Amino acid sequence: MTARRREAAPAKKRRNLLKSLGIERVDYKDTSTLRQFISERGKIRSRSVTGLTVQQQRQVTTAVKTAREMALLPYPGQNPTGR
């Protein structure tokens, strides 16, 4: 008997969020935009999830880390509910 192979599902097209918003430079003070790149637990989302380029991912990472230093965004592990 020959085994049947499953056909692979078509690859999901990743959308570049920064490009769709028309943002060229990421600013650490723009917390509403930065929150879109942070998970519910406060971790920075990966490129495979966000669809950013390498340079854009570096900008987002630097901006998020700076915003955390300035206490504009929470660090991962800090639970806002106090649990």
Swiss-Prot record:
<dbReference type="GO" id="GO:0006412">
    <property type="term" value="P:translation"/>
</dbReference>
<keyword id="KW-0689">Ribosomal protein</keyword>
<keyword id="KW-0699">rRNA-binding</keyword>
<dbReference type="GO" id="GO:0003735">
    <property type="term" value="F:structural constituent of ribosome"/>
</dbReference>
<dbReference type="GO" id="GO:0022627">
    <property type="term" value="C:cytosolic small ribosomal subunit"/>
</dbReference>
<comment type="similarity">
    <text>Belongs to the bacterial ribosomal protein bS18 family.</text>
</comment>
<comment type="function">
    <text>Binds as a heterodimer with protein bS6 to the central domain of the 16S rRNA, where it helps stabilize the platform of the 30S subunit.</text>
</comment>
<dbReference type="GO" id="GO:0070181">
    <property type="term" value="F:small ribosomal subunit rRNA binding"/>
</dbReference>
<dbReference type="InterPro" id="IPR001648">
    <property type="entry name" value="Ribosomal_bS18"/>
</dbReference>
<keyword id="KW-0687">Ribonucleoprotein</keyword>
<keyword id="KW-0694">RNA-binding</keyword>
<comment type="subunit">
    <text>Part of the 30S ribosomal subunit. Forms a tight heterodimer with protein bS6.</text>
</comment>
<dbReference type="Pfam" id="PF01084">
    <property type="entry name" value="Ribosomal_S18"/>
</dbReference>
<dbReference type="InterPro" id="IPR036870">
    <property type="entry name" value="Ribosomal_bS18_sf"/>
</dbReference>
<protein>
    <recommendedName>
        <fullName>Small ribosomal subunit protein bS18A</fullName>
    </recommendedName>
</protein>
